[in-house]
């Protein structure tokens, strides 16, 4: 029996000055927008301010995760600090969920008692938001194309951009038609958008924390690819999980044919897993005969699939 363990740095997350400037711009604008929202009493402005705060959190999570990812592993954290991004995303999603519920309740209360709103401050708030978001998008757009961590922050900013457009629509409808219910209606609608966004963030974070298989990886397909290699008789106890976004890990057992060269099989399998599926860290156990794994049937996906097909 032989084992090989290997790791590759791959693409390390990087915060960069663009991310930091974006965080500062968005943070300052959140304070201004929340002040305008409380002053005018606009549910749409307040809901967008909450989401702007979430965007600040998303950018800060990306920055902190990028910096923590560079910390070396130690005896207490043998995989390093990659999971900091996932924990931060879960907290961010929970906060976004709470904000969504608050906005929906505020909107429902305002439906029962609509109030006239000063539209000029609302338009100024939206204009400032669009300017801030355009600058932020320009700062991190290029980096988001190659960094999944930054891409998450980018989507937060895009959602705040949509919120600013909703404020403009609200202010213009009130100014030219006097239809006051547009504010709570759009506020509630945006609250449900926040609810949807929070669910997506929390679902993905929980899936990763539970060491779920990445969405773009099929264990069945990987097993078949391994068994198609020369010298591999069987692949079992295969596991794939993500330390954080885009950092995939794989482990598995390979039973090789009696006339096969274990080292050659190991090298070929390792290269295929890295090049075809993008695993940055792989642990493969090579066997000439299946070992006693009677206490681990529950976590052998390949065995469960074979039994279900029998």
Language-model segment annotations:
Residues 21-33:
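The first (N-terminal) embedded transmembrane alpha-helix
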């Amino acid at each position: 029996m032989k084992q090989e363990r290997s790791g590759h740095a791959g693409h390390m997350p990087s915060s960069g000055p663009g991310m930091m400037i974006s965080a500062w711009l968005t943070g300052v604008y959140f304070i201004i927008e929340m002040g305008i929202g409380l002053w005018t009493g606009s549910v749409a402005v307040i809901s967008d301010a909450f989401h702007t705060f979430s965007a600040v959190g998303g950018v800060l999570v990306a920055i902190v995760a990028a910096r923590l990812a560079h910390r070396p592993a130690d005896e207490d954290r043998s995989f390093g600090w990659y999971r900091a991004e996932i924990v931060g995303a879960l907290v961010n999603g929970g906060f976004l969920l709470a904000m969504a519920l608050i906005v929906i309740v505020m909107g429902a209360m305002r439906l029962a008692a609509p109030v006239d709103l000063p539209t000029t401050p609302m338009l100024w708030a939206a204009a400032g938001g669009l300017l801030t978001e355009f600058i932020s998008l320009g700062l991190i757009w290029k980096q988001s194309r190659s960094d999944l961590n930054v891409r998450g922050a980018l989507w937060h900013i895009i959602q705040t951009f949509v919120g600013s457009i909703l404020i403009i629509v609200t202010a213009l409808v009130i100014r030219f038609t006097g239809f006051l219910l547009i504010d709570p209606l759009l506020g509630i609608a945006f609250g449900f958008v926040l609810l949807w966004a929070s669910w997506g963030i929390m679902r993905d974070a929980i899936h990763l924390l539970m060491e779920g298989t990445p969405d773009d990886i099929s264990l069945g397909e990987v097993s078949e690819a391994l068994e198609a290699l020369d010298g591999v008789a069987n692949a079992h106890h295969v596991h794939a999980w993500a330390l954080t976004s885009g950092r995939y890990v794989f482990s598995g057992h390979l039973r090789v044919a009696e006339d096969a060269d274990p080292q050659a099989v190991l090298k070929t399998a390792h290269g295929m897993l890295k090049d075809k599926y993008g695993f940055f860290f792989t642990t493969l156990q090579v066997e000439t005969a299946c070992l006693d794994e009677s206490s681990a049937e529950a976590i052998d996906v390949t065995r469960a699939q074979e039994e279900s097909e029998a």
